[in-house]
Every structure is written in C-alpha cells, then in structure tokens.
Amino acid sequence: MHRITILGATGSIGESTLDVVRRHADRYVVHALTAHRQVRKLADQCVEFRPARAVVGTAEAALELETLLRDAGVKTEVSHGEAALESVAADAQTDSVMAAIVGAAGLRPTLAAARAGKRVLLANKEALVMSGRIFMDAVREHGATLLPIDSEHNAIFQCLPADDPRYGRGVARVLLTASGGPFRTRDPATLHDISPDQACAHPNWVMGRKISVDSATMMNKGLEVIEAHWLFGAPAERIEVLIHPQSIVHSMVAYTDGSVLAQLGNPDMRTPIAYGLAYPERIDAGVTPLDLTVAGGLHFEKPDLVRFPCLGLAFDALRAGGVAPAALNAANEVAVEAFLGGTVRFTDIAGIVRQVLEATPQGPADTLEAVLSADALAREAAREGVAALAAKR
C-alpha cells in the first residue's frame, strides 16, 4: 500500500485528492492530513480515512479536533503548529506528500518533504515561486521525486520527453494556457467595481477564493510562469501564455521541428492528481471523458497586459530574479486578502504589487533566510500600501 500525506486536506485540492484515494482504497492509505482552521471538516476526513496523524494550525484547533475524534472513537495523533507540519511532511512512514497548502505558508513543509526525499506532488506553486533554486537543489540533493499537480504544469510534464522532462532536447517553447478568468471580455473601465464574489466566480474551475482572485487578475498565470521556469528550466523568453477560454487544452509544448504537443481533458483537478499519484501508471480519476464533438471549437488569443497587468509584473519579477518573485508573491497575497476583506478595490491589487516590487531591495535568493526576509519586508510594504488606499476611500 502506498502511504500518502496531504498538506491542506480541507482545501479544493485536498478534497479532490481524497476523492481519488477513495476510488482506489486497494492502492493507497492516508497516513496524515493537515488543515489550518477547518477543524470539523478535517475531523470528518479523519473519521473516514483514519490517518495516523493530523496537524492543525493552533493549540485551540488541536484541542477541538482531539475532542471530536475522541467522541468518534478515532485514535489519530493530533498536533499543531509549523514544526508539526514540517515533521509530518518528512515523516518516515509516508511515501508521497501532496503539497496543497495555499500561499507562502506551504513553503517550509513542502521543502521539508523534498529534503526528506519524498515523492512530492506539488500543488503549492509558491514553494517554487519564492525559493525555486533552493527547492530544486533540495529535490536533486536528497533524491526526491517532484511531480507537478497544477493542471498546466502537469500537462507540460506529459508533453515533454518522458526520459528528461526539461527544456532542451528540441523544445522551442513552453505554452501555458489560461482561461482568462471571469473578466476576459469585460470593459476594463468597469473593473474597479468588481466585488469579491464576482472575482471568485470562475467560469470553468472550482477553486478556493484566493486562487480564484489570482485567476481573475491572471496573477495565477504569472506565478505559473515562474513555476514553469524552475520546473522545466525554460527561460522567460521561451515561456508563452495563451488565453484559451474553453480550458480544454491545459498546456502545450512546441518543438523545433514544428510539432506542437498538447494535453487535453475536461477541467477537473482529479486528472492531474490521479496522474501524480499513480505515475508512471494511469488510474481512473472519476473524471467525465472529454468528447471533442461536444466541446466544440477551441480558441486561443494573446493576453492583454493592459487588462491583466499582474501577468506582466510576474514576467518582470522572473527576469529580475533573486528575491523579486518572493516579493511579488508576498505583495499579491496581502493585496488579495485586502480585496477579499473589502479594504481595497480589485484594480488596486496590481498597483500594490507594482509599488512593492519597485521598493523591494534586490538580492540573491540563495538561502531560505534571505527569501523569508524579503517576504516579510514585502508584506509590510504591501500592508502600508493597503492602509494608504483604505485611508483615501
């Protein structure tokens, strides 16, 4: 039996992972589950899957979870805090770690899994955005296996040469597709009135609120560009973003002989999750098969960087290198949180990120301390930007 730990079990990726595991109880056993504060949902998962360990964010949440599990007769060991997250990610009793904690909070436990030589199913893009070189070095030095779970990077992985899924070997370009989000055709002059609920109403995918906003601004695609650079070794000028509203073609790889290989499928995260869990085999993911006669036309267009300035900022950060991507990510997390909380407007997000990038001192991202220091400075600068905008409203 293959033993799995899921970091971020109560989020959309975590729940989809458990759905795939549920379909293949003869192959997989859940060793550990983690969540930050959705204690009751985590308790329900523990009752069903009986993991050996569970980790939550705070002592209060741990006490609540222990009570719920004791009442249910479940003997899962409960712990809390960052150190417990890192411990469970590196646990010798687990084989694969699904890294699905959203944002910078997922960096340390994901890095711990890599350093423990685990099979890392990477759904947390921030680990590579913030500390790409550190993370990839850890994977190589400790013999970890890294499998991308983001639908786009999973698609690229499938389209690259199987024996060496890296840029080179006749690869001309990496083509990342993007739906364009809910505001692809909306008049840019009206975007300042967008509500959080409107921004979270993605036309094709079911996602959490933060990543839904990132999709609406296309910052999500910008972070994926940086992630693709580190995963596949592709330089910025060889990574291209195409808007594809149908979300059927998940990404493509163009080769020097004129060939373009694409991975297609219905928009359902269980497909890349199942691919990562079973690699190099294939298993049923529970996804409705794609019927191209029903899907209709497939359309592609270049992104409008006036409508989507966050995408351009991400390319700028990738080209700048060093701690710039960490600052980009930190500023975006603060700005999106402020937007979801009603403190700033949708159109303020890009401005806050740009201001922070311009103010962040440049430096190498060669140590985790340097990355986390840049992250902290960028968050403080972003909070100041949010406060200044809020004072004007």
Swiss-Prot record:
List of residues binding 1-deoxy-D-xylulose 5-phosphate: 125, 151-152, 179, 202, 215, 220-221, 224
Pfam families: DXP_redisom_C, DXP_reductoisom, DXPR_C
Binding site residues for NADPH: 10-13, 37-38, 124, 126, 208
UniProtKB keywords: Isoprene biosynthesis, Manganese, Metal-binding, NADP, Oxidoreductase
Obligatory cofactor(s): Mg(2+); Mn(2+)
EC number: 1.1.1.267
Single GO biological process annotation from the record: isopentenyl diphosphate biosynthetic process, methylerythritol 4-phosphate pathway involved in terpenoid biosynthetic process
Enzyme class label: oxidoreductase
MF-aspect GO terms: 1-deoxy-D-xylulose-5-phosphate reductoisomerase activity; manganese ion binding; NADPH binding
Function field: Catalyzes the NADPH-dependent rearrangement and reduction of 1-deoxy-D-xylulose-5-phosphate (DXP) to 2-C-methyl-D-erythritol 4-phosphate (MEP).
Protein name (Swiss-Prot/TrEMBL): 1-deoxy-D-xylulose 5-phosphate reductoisomerase
Originating gene: dxr
